[in-house]
Amino acid sequence: MKAAGLGDLTVDELVSLKIQNVTPEYIRGLHELGLHLDVDTVVSMKIQGVTPEYIHEVRELGLTPDDDQIVGMKIQGVTPDYVRGIRDAGFKPDVDQLISMRIQGVTPEYVRALREQGLQPDGDDVVSMRIQHVDIEYIRAIHALGFKPTVDEFVSMRIQGVTPEYIKALQAAGLTFDMEELVDARIQGVTAEFIAKAAKHGFKNLTLEKLIQLKQTGVLDSEADI
């Protein structure tokens, strides 16, 4: 190991290197890439299957991850093929974005499908969409109802639990609305049942904005004196 560039090793360090099958050739391969690492980092890389060849391929793609990022990329399965696929889909993410995208299950196919639906999310957007389960089926269902939300609106809708069924119920009540009003209505708990209850008490033909205001007043709550 001393000949490979690792000198003055403790017994524990030698044992760790031996257990993980860290060879002098492996160390030299890292050194040839300009990586002069401590024993703990070398062991971490070996445990995760980081090879000099992997690092070389990643750099060939124009990425310059640091030691921790290299390990993170390998742990999360960020392969050169994955990077190429994401780039071919129209993204140019940095290392941290690639790791986040892989963690959240962002695939090139998902990105292409979003673009086919007319959406143009950036790297951070697409991660948020995956986190909030904004899948292609959900997007298509919303589009089929005549709405074209932005990326941020889709994320907000999903966070607040706006479903196609909820939209249909509001439409069936004769309401028209934009995405902001729709999300506000969901937050405030304006439902088809509430709309029917309002009509029963004489609050008919209200706009969604007025229904939201009515819900906020609480005058139709069961405890209220109507």
Residue ranges and their predicted role:
Residues 1-226:
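General marker for long, soluble alpha-helical cores
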